[in-house]
Design a protein with these regions (language model features):
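Short C-terminal boundary/hinge segments that cap the last helix of small helical domains
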Residues: 69-81
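C-terminal regulatory/oligomerization modules of transcriptional regulators
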Residues: 1-3
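Conserved hydrophobic/aromatic packing and binding residues within compact polymer-binding modules
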Residues: 21, 35-36, 46-49, 75
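Short basic helix-loop element that most often maps to the first helix and adjoining turn
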Residues: 19-38, 63, 68
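Recognition helix of helix-turn-helix/homeodomain-like DNA-binding domains
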Residues: 40-54
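A short, Lys/Arg-rich alpha-helix, primarily the initiator
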Residues: 5-26
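Hydrophobic micro-packing sites on short alpha-helices
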Residues: 60-65, 75-76
Length: 81
């Protein structure tokens, strides 16, 4: 199986952000699908974000943060960034 060539895949910062998104999502009782619908992004993309596989655009970070009840800064803080 071929490896992903995306140079951002699994960067520590993306993994930390993904873990923070997953943790907050679970804390507030949202499924990936519910978060995706609320943020108007695909559910499979949310899964990839939570695994640190996607280099998110700022607009998507802010949309996800808002849907999780956080500001972008609060989400970054939760991720240790």
């Amino acid at each position: 199986m071929a490896k992903k060539s995306n140079r951002y895949s699994y960067a520590p910062e993306l993994v930390a952000l993904g873990k923070a998104i997953r943790l907050v999502r679970l804390e507030i009782g949202l499924s990936q699908e519910a978060l995706a619908l609320s943020a108007e992004i695909d559910r499979s993309y949310v899964g990839g974000i939570e695994r640190g596989e996607h280099n998110l655009a700022l607009v998507n970070i802010l949309k996800l943060a808002r849907c999780l009840g956080l500001s972008g800064a609060q989400l970054m803080h939760r991720a240790g960034l």
